[in-house]
Every structure is written in structure tokens, then in C-alpha cells.
């Protein structure tokens, strides 16, 4: 069984390239340091997920990602729409800058970002002072865990630990929209 981590222990695990599990708005998530390519590949291997799909970043402050984003390419109206939806359960695919790591964007020219209103996710990101990879805690193609006790036992030996707490109670994972077009990619 993976160890339960405090926020400061989770930050240490992330700094060391570890993958952690934590509750999100609807399901349990897996996260790691998005700046560490090895950590991201470890997470992808745990999930058995293709690297080309891209990954979501969750953060407490958009400015933690300013070097990876090209927000000047969005219309003022669209940028206002994005910012007005946060914090909240809305993920937006924002225009990525050339500095955005390819191991996060996958085969895309955008970066999927959510500023979470979930208290634990927000506290974790603030303690970490950086964005965090946020992908469902399950093997690709399997159902995501809605409770800690539902985490797939095959994932646990590969985790640096678990930040315990309740999910946000949403019935479905967060929506994903393209910030350039406004199109809904996942409802």
C-alpha cells in the first residue's frame, strides 16, 4: 500500500521525480512534476498511456505556466471567457509557446490547463508553487477511481505516495474546451 503524504511530503516526492495520487474534482488523479521528462514518462508508463495524447496541467495560479503559454494569440474576449471560468472544473486547451515541453503537449500545439477550485488540489499546487500533471488514476481504458479505496492496486507500488482527501463530488471529469475556437472537446 502506498504511503499517505502530507502536503510538504508530497512536494518533496514531486521534487524527487515521484508520481503521487490525489483527489480531484471528480476522480482520483495521478500527478508529477511537469518539468521533469523522466517523471512524466514514469507516469505515462504507470497508466500505460500513449505519450502523444498530451496531458492536463492543474495549477492554483496561471502565472506558474506563463513561459509555456502564448496567450497573446487569443482574442481579449476569449481570454476573458477562460479566466472567468476559473477557478473551477473547466480545463482549457490554451495556445502553447515554443518553450512548452513536448512530453506534455504530445502531438498538439496547445497546453491543457485547469485552475482548480478543489481545496486540496489548490493547496497542493500552492505548496508546490508550480503546476502539476493531472490525469486520472487508472490504467488507460479502465474506469477512474472515485474513492481512495478504489485505486487500482497495480498502480500503488509505483507511487511515491498518496495525498488523502475527498474528491470534489462532481459526477463527471472536468470539461475540456479549446480556447481558440471555444469548441467542447470533452463534456
Swiss-Prot record:
Entry EC no(s): 2.7.7.87
Subcellular location: Cytoplasm
One Gene Ontology biological process: tRNA threonylcarbamoyladenosine modification
Domain of life according to the entry: Bacteria
Gene Ontology CC: cytoplasm
One function term, GO molecular function aspect: double-stranded RNA binding
Catalytic reaction(s) noted: L-threonine + hydrogencarbonate + ATP = L-threonylcarbamoyladenylate + diphosphate + H2O
Ranges where the YrdC-like domain occurs: 4-187
Main localization (coarse): cytoplasm
Listed InterPro entries: DHBP_synth_RibB-like_a/b_dom, Sua5-like_dom, TC-AMP_synthase, TC-AMP_synthase_SUA5
Keyword Cell wall biogenesis/degradation: no
Top EC class for this record: transferase
Keywords for this protein: ATP-binding, Cytoplasm, Nucleotide-binding, Nucleotidyltransferase, Transferase, tRNA processing
Family statement drawn from the similarity comment of this UniProt entry: Belongs to the SUA5 family. TsaC subfamily.
Role played: Required for the formation of a threonylcarbamoyl group on adenosine at position 37 (t(6)A37) in tRNAs that read codons beginning with adenine. Catalyzes the conversion of L-threonine, HCO(3)(-)/CO(2) and ATP to give threonylcarbamoyl-AMP (TC-AMP) as the acyladenylate intermediate, with the release of diphosphate.
Name of the protein: Threonylcarbamoyl-AMP synthase
Organism of this sequence: Xylella fastidiosa (strain M12)
Gene name of the encoded protein: tsaC
Amino acid at each position: 500500500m502506498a504511503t499517505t503524504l502530507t502536503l510538504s511530503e508530497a512536494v518533496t516526492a514531486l521534487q524527487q521525480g515521484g508520481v503521487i495520487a490525489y483527489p480531484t474534482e471528480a476522480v482520483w488523479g495521478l500527478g508529477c512534476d511537469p518539468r521533469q521528462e523522466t517523471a512524466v514518462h514514469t507516469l505515462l508508463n504507470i497508466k500505460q498511456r500513449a505519450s502523444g495524447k498530451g496531458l492536463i496541467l492543474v495549477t492554483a495560479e496561471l502565472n506558474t505556466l506563463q513561459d509555456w503559454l502564448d496567450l497573446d494569440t487569443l482574442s481579449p474576449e476569449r481570454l476573458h471567457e477562460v479566466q472567468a471560468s476559473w477557478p473551477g472544473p473547466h480545463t482549457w486547451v490554451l495556445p502553447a509557446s515554443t518553450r512548452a515541453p513536448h512530453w506534455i503537449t504530445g502531438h498538439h500545439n496547445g497546453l491543457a490547463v485547469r485552475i482548480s477550485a478543489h481545496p486540496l488540489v489548490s493547496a497542493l499546487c500552492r505548496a508546490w508553487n508550480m503546476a502539476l500533471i493531472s490525469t486520472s488514476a487508472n490504467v488507460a481504458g479502465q474506469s477512474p477511481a472515485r474513492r481512495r479505496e478504489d485505486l487500482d492496486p497495480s498502480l500503488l507500488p509505483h507511487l511515491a505516495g498518496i495525498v488523502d482527501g475527498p474528491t470534489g463530488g462532481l459526477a463527471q471529469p472536468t470539461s475540456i474546451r479549446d480556447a481558440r475556437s471555444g469548441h467542447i472537446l470533452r463534456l
